[in-house]
């Protein structure tokens, strides 16, 4: 299992490195080319964790006008030029042993330190998903349809969604949307199953997530047209009854007010 969290960069070597790079890139000539009046310099510090902090990798990326040109990877142990623009800086910094030693030490000083800070909040955060099933169109027996299993509002992003028909896993005709970010540190995904409705079929959406002790199982049953008609008739009769009840109460209330007068 691996994870990545953003670095909180302390004042020190990496901040100083930014200043040096800005001075170099702001010079009139860089690698034999005129430097534009306006340019964008970016620095990205990344920490990768494998099995907690048993193995930690730190990567520093230097980006000029949206193109990475220089990189320090703790697994490599030295600076490497990604483009010709980064070669002079890589050669210069690799010749300074004190710089290399400090960069190698950043893995412990920054990555492992920040992991301990984030572990109790971001890394251990769990939000259980909500799972619902709905057909993409009105049910019709012996016709193709699409069942949509909506898995929403979960964190972290890793989730496993499976479709079953009468207890047997369905793999053909399964399509999933990309993972969707909700913008509040939760995610959602839609997993669709193309099927031919048959009376009595039972479809199950099974969801596994790290926030759950047991998988969530949501069932959906195909209904016959007569059953749907009966259900709609029952709902219609219930609504009509409520209307007449309300009308009767209203008339009675008006009559009582007339008697009081």
Swiss-Prot record:
PROSITE patterns: IG_LIKE, IG_MHC
Disulphide bond pairs: 47-111, 149-205
List of glycosylated residues: 51
Cellular localisation: Membrane
Coiled-coil features, chain-numbered ranges: none
Family to which the UniProt record says this protein belongs: Belongs to the MHC class II family.
Gene Ontology terms describing biological process: adaptive immune response; antigen processing and presentation of exogenous peptide antigen via MHC class II; peptide antigen assembly with MHC class II protein complex; positive regulation of immune response; positive regulation of T cell activation
Extracellular side: 32-230
SUPFAM superfamilies named in the record: Immunoglobulin, MHC antigen-recognition domain
Region Beta-2, annotated ranges: 127-220
Transmembrane segments: 231-251
One of the Pfam families matching this protein, by short name: MHC_II_beta
Region (Connecting peptide): 221-230
Membrane topology per record: Single-pass type I membrane protein
Superkingdom classification of source: Eukaryota
Name of this chain's protein: SLA class II histocompatibility antigen, DQ haplotype C beta chain
Cytoplasmic side: 252-261
Residue segments, region Beta-1: 32-126
Organism: Sus scrofa
Keyword Nucleotidyltransferase: no
Gene Ontology cellular-component terms listed: late endosome membrane; lysosomal membrane; MHC class II protein complex
């Amino acid at each position: 299992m691996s994870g990545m969290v953003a670095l909180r960069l302390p004042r020190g070597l990496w901040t100083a490195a930014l200043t040096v790079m800005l001075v170099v890139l702001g010079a009139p000539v860089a690698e034999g080319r005129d430097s534009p009046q306006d340019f964008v310099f970016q620095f990205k510090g990344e920490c990768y964790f494998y099995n907690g902090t048993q193995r930690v990798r730190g990567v520093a990326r230097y980006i000029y006008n949206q193109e990475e040109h220089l990189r320090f990877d703790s697994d490599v142990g030295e600076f490497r030029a990604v483009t010709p623009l980064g070669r002079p800086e890589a050669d210069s910094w690799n010749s300074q042993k004190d710089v290399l030693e400090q960069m190698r030490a950043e893995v412990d000083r920054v990555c492992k330190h920040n992991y301990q800070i984030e572990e109790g909040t971001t890394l251990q955060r769990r939000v259980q998903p909500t799972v619902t099933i709905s057909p993409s169109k009105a049910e019709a027996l012996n016709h193709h349809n699409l069942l949509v299993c909506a898995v929403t509002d979960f964190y972290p992003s890793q989730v496993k969604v499976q479709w079953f028909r009468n207890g047997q896993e369905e793999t053909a005709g399964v399509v999933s949307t990309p993972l969707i970010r909700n913008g509040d540190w939760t995610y959602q995904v839609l997993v669709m199953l193309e099927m031919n409705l048959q009376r009595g079929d039972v479809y199950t959406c099974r969801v596994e997530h790290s926030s759950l002790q047991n998988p969530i199982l949501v069932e959906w049953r195909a209904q016959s047209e007569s059953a749907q008609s009966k259900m709609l008739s029952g709902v219609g009769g219930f609504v009509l009854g409520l209307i007449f009840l309300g009308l009767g109460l209203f008339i009675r209330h008006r009559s009582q007010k007339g008697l009081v007068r």
